[in-house]
Amino acid sequence: MPVEVAEPDMRSIQKEDHDDAMHEKSYRVGIEVPVSVSFTNSGQWYQLPGGGRIWRVSLICKGAQAIGLNYNEIRLPAGADIFVYTSDQKSVIGALTSTEIPQNQKFTTRPLSGDGITLEYYEPPSVKEQAVIDIEGLVYIYRGFEAQNPENNKSLASGSCEVNVNCDEGLNWQKQKRGVVKILTKVGAKYYSCTGSLLNNTAQDFKGLLLTAAHCSKDSNNGVASDSDFTQWIFYFNYEYSGCVPGGTTITSIVGAQKLAISETPSDIGSDFLLMQSLKSVPAQYNAFYCGWDADNENSPSGVCIHHPDGDVKKISTYTSPLSTGTWGSTPNTHWLVNWSATANGYGVTEPGSSGAPLFNKEGLLIGTLTGGDSWCDNTSGVDKFGRIPYSWISNGISANMRLKPWLDPGNILEADGKLIMNGSFNDKLAVADFTANTFVIPIGGTINFYDLSAGIPSKWHWYFQGGKPSEATEKNPSGIVFDRFGKMNVKLVVTNAFNSDSIVKEGFIDVRAIVSPNPCYGVVNILTDKNNESGIVIEVFDFQGKIAQRFEYSGSTSDSYSIKLPESGNLFIVKVIQGKQVQIHKVIVIH
């Protein structure tokens, strides 16, 4: 039975959100509902044929637009994994292993669309270590995630004037858009939506520096995100429609960050910046762009802002008149003032949820982060204010944790030429796992050689062979791996270099075939499978017209060889071998 979680008091929440909107507070999208779910009090264990077991637990919280899970502790043994999926299984996270889940800290899995969610833990028979899964909170999302619903084909969250980033207006900003992220922030039990950007630095070490607004780390009552809260922030990459019209949304994300620097003091917000470092390297397959920036005081005559208004997919707003300087709090010249321009596909403005979004100059360099303003679809002439990178560089305070400079120019490289400019870049140093093999189809008992194709010059390799002997290897190119189990087998490779680790799982990569011989035959064939057949073996014989002629069932057999006498009439038969969920088809010719 699923764990039914009581819906939060939405009437009270909506009233609070209405009051917050009137006072330009952060855009709340969700609330954490406390739960206590673990092996000892919830879910169901299932023993698997041949060993191993699964623990499965489902949670339902009616009315949710999306649901995520917060873990007080999660510790998985090597070889074990978890999947998290929606009730209809249209959205899936996983497999997550001990490689992907950080140790000794809290963790979260991102919200999935709908009001029901299931966690499935798989434990192979070889595991001796005790896993720990302690779910302490259900993340109840009630707005801002409309585009993540696979059934939706319209952009429902943000204003109708907004322009999708892959319309014509975004053609010259395709690199920069890959450095813009949607952020689901956690402040205590409250969840907010903001926008941020991934930054390059002069060391070009691709550390995962993420910039947003300082006020994104506060709730509507000025409560501040704790260090523990930051470990459960979620950063969404490439959250956009594939074209100018709704459709083709993809969702990729990383979890967790560490706060490095913030502009705010108890008396003044300053230039309203927050700089973080992601706890995990940005996966190479995200093809993320590390944005360049300009900390000089030069004005920009034109440019764009790329953002996630109201938590929606990525939008682009364009300015075509020179910026001016102004203030948000009490300190002068902390912000750029921006007026937006109409374009071919709309009139891009900003909205709640756009906070922290990058402002780019005409050279494509980041020069500001959004604090707020009064532009919206019914007030397109309103002015928006972006904290200036030139001010954030060193002017908010004297310590490193109030400046951008120590983190963006750690070696003081830019002091030599006097230009505080850094171009953006894609990361060509990351390890990206990939591999191939000398063959993909083998008979029972056959051997395969594997070849590493990973980018980034890995220094360590860890292979996992489902059904293989040995089941693991640490060489670069392992050879002679024996597969003596019937069916399609998964192969996983984890590679590591000086910068990161990456993994890839190729499902059903090796097709281990039953041996049907002799073929051609004189009416009798022998079928060799394997002894791992607790689920039983079914052999079906079809004639050339597709009609079933024979059916044999072997339940609980420990044999790996079966002799079948084929029908006396006919020269061509199809032999179907079924073992559990594995099905193979063989053509057999009979000589009379």
Task: Tell me the role of every PLM-derived stretch.
Residues 429-437, 513-516:
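Proline-enriched interdomain boundary motifs that mark the N-terminal boundary
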Residues 458-481:
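Surface-exposed, flexible coil segments in extracellular/virion-facing regions
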